[in-house]
Each structure stands twice: as C-alpha cells, then as structure tokens.
Amino acid sequence: MLDGLRSGVAGAMPAFAASAPQACYEVLAAWKDGDAGLAEEKQARLQDVAETVEEKLGIAGIKFGCDLNGYFGGRPRLPLLPLTGEERAEIEALMRGLRN
C-alpha cells in the first residue's frame, strides 16, 4: 500500500483492509499527516500478515480475518474450501497485534 502512496495515488483499497481496516487506515493516515517514518513502521507491521492472508490463504484467509475482527467473513463458497485448523491458528497468531 505504501508503495502506491509514494507513487502518488490518493488512496488504496487492499484486500487485507477487509480483515484489518484500522491497521490499513493507520498507514494511510500517517502518510497523509506527512509522517513517512510512521507510515513505514505501520506498513512493516502488517506486511507479512497481509502477504500470508491474501497471497497464501486467499479469500478463505481474508474471510477468516474478518471473522477475527468482529466482522462477518463467513465460509468461502465452493469450489473454495474453508481453512484448516492449522491455517486458522496461523492467522490468529499473525493478527494478534492487528485486532480492532
């Protein structure tokens, strides 16, 4: 997200924002306040989590992240499968510091 802001976009809507909207907003807010250092710190905090949830676990990961933060994610529709217990535990551990 921060790369896009550096290149001049006015905002961003990453898929991970569905799972952790506050954490994503904090990156944007720090950037808009002119605090690039804080924006980088906030981005670094969620980078690995976002990559795992979006790229490795996909839609099922995003939906489970939503459920963790008190939103309705629900089960993915077929042909996508729900996460395994191990995958859910991985997301819970990664998102521990990003819960709303």
Whereabouts are the PLM-identified features?
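A general structural signal for well-ordered alpha-helical segments in protein cores
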Residues: 1, 21-24, 59-65, 88
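Catalytic alpha/beta core domains of metabolic enzymes, predominantly
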Residues: 1-54
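Conserved short secondary-structure transition element at the edge of the structured enzyme core
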Residues: 5-9, 45-80
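Short alpha-helix boundary/capping motifs
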Residues: 31-33, 67, 90-94
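Flexible C-terminal active-site loop/helix
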Residues: 72-100
